[in-house]
Amino acid sequence: MSEVELKPVHRIALGIEYDGSKYYGWQRQNEVRSVQEKLEKALSQVANQPIAVCCAGRTDAGVHGTGQVVHFETTSVRKDAAWTLGVNANLPGDIAVRWVKDVPDDFHARFSATARRYRYIIYNQRLRPAVLGQGVTHFYEPLDAERMQRAAQSLIGENDFTSFRAVQCQSRTPWRNVMHINVSRYGAYVVVDIKANAFVHHMVRNIVGSLMEVGAGHQPESWIAELLAAKDRTLAAATAKAEGLYLVSVDYPERFDLPKPPMGPLFLAD
């Protein structure tokens, strides 16, 4: 065997934050910008060998992340500062490594995850924002966040989310277990916070689109429960825009002991 083949392989996990505004989603694609492509390029420069990453959840074009988790394997030995500060020095300003952790061989960023948590931020004022405009979704009609909160509670538990599932979704089943969903107002901002074991394609944005109809008074509070029972995507509201959506946290078994930095984004407390 060669000397290279004898080198031990290390599995490393990273926490990643990114502004998805200028990317065609997380996943590497030919001829378009992706978060994965930029991260793998920066990691490969630091490792001095090709690096491929696996992520906890592939976000769509325009969607952001403050709590994305990835893992990769390498024979390169580097200090933690190289995998954080060094990689960040090679990344564009809208992508950053938040933490690094050596993990055992049975850790997998996607398959070891037990839950994912998203936050959707709505800027609820008559006129659009100029600052952070790509990090929020503007909705000009007044929203009743308390009404939205009450309506949303019908989604908690294990349910068939066909009514909130994109037509092109490739998941084998529409059943998901929603652990919590909370709608809160912070001044001009309405935040929808939802955690589930996993999500079908566009599930959060489809739920938010329908909740905004309830919050604006266009539909009764009971409408969300009716949509869930109907199992018909055509009856629900339009998909909410990507700009306001953030993957903020991914849960793993405690034995992996991964860091838990503040979820955010920005001023939002855990």
Swiss-Prot record:
Gene Ontology MF terms in the entry: RNA binding; tRNA pseudouridine(38-40) synthase activity
Site keyed Interaction with tRNA: positions: 58, 78, 110, 126, 139
Residues where substrate binds: 118
Organism listed in the record: Enterobacter sp. (strain 638)
Region described as RNA binding: 107-111
Gene Ontology BP term (one): tRNA pseudouridine synthesis
Taxonomic lineage from the root: Bacteria, Pseudomonadati, Pseudomonadota, Gammaproteobacteria, Enterobacterales
Transmembrane segments: none
Enzyme Commission code: 5.4.99.12
Protein name: tRNA pseudouridine synthase A
Covalent S-S links between cysteines: none
